[in-house]
A protein has these predicted regions:
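Conserved, structured core segments of small domains
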Residues: 1-97
């Protein structure tokens, strides 16, 4: 498996109807929960004061990450930054593979 640090900034248009925004957010929340339970979306943190998050994904390949990110309901409204991660030799944790 491969770990990726992903920052997602969400920018919904001000003109988007509230009902559409609420449905997109509900769909996103459901998919995010499923992916977390599956172990693919390993960590999810909100960035204080922003409509953004920092996440760690644990997937088999860059292609799988791309497919996963582009399947997110909010993807069309996101600016995404991806950084591949590898284990640091000085880490004292055995489970941060």
């Amino acid at each position: 498996m491969m770990l990726f640090h992903v920052r997602m900034n969400v920018n919904l248009p001000m003109t988007m109807p509230a009902e559409q925004a609420a449905q997109l957010k509900a769909d996103e929340k459901a998919l995010a929960a499923r992916l977390q339970h599956e172990g693919k979306w390993r960590h999810l943190w909100r960035i204080a004061g922003q409509y953004a998050n920092i996440s760690v994904f644990d997937v088999a390949s860059v292609d799988e990450l791309h497919t996963l990110l582009t399947s997110l309901p909010l993807f069309p409204y996101m600016q995404i930054e991806v950084m591949p991660l590898c284990r640091h030799p000085s880490s004292v944790r055995d489970n941060d593979l």
